[in-house]
């Protein structure tokens, strides 16, 4: 979950979840935003959805962090399906994506102009990012990632960089 950087003015709350496909046999990370009225979420809409849906709801990542420009980072695990998808720029699994608060892709994302690549991608080659935050001084995104048998990582994801999973 994350609050809009302008929450006091706009009231938007963002929630990540494992969204099933229409058959219910696979899932992918999705982000919904809405406003709380009492104990209900109103004015809600999905602003991000991982396509294609690949997993059975594991290794979905799903951490949300806003940067100081109002972009939303969404972590995506490798979905535990053919981990090589983390290296494929036409798929969103094994990636950190960056979108605008309304779900649009920022024009300065690193793969916006690359044919065959998903414009949402910020960095790739991730196994399963489970923690993410902005550094309080540098304001850079920091992310923690589970290794397959130990070897957990702390990364500072940079635009367009490959973090190696599963080849390194």
Where are these regions (language model features)?
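Acidic, Gly/Ser/Thr-rich repeat motifs that build Ca2+-stabilized beta-propeller blades
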Residues: 2-83, 131-134, 139-147
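Beta-propeller domain segments
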Residues: 6-8, 30, 69, 73, ...
């Amino acid at each position: 979950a994350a609050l809009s950087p302008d929450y006091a003015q706009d009231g938007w709350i963002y929630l990540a979840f494992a969204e099933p496909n229409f058959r219910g046999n696979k899932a992918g990370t999705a982000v919904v935003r809405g406003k709380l009225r009492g104990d209900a979420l109103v004015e809600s809409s999905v602003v991000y959805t991982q396509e294609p849906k690949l997993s059975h709801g594991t290794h979905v990542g799903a951490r949300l962090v806003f940067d100081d420009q109002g972009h939303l980072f969404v972590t995506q695990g490798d979905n535990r399906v053919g981990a090589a998808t983390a290296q494929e720029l036409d798929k969103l699994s094994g990636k950190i994506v960056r979108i605008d608060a309304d779900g649009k892709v920022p024009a300065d994302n690193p793969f916006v102009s690359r044919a065959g690549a998903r414009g949402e991608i910020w960095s790739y080659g991730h196994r399963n990012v489970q923690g993410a935050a902005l550094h309080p001084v540098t304001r850079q995104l920091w992310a923690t990632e589970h290794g397959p048998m130990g070897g957990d990582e702390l990364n500072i994801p940079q635009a367009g960089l490959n973090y190696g999973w599963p080849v390194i």
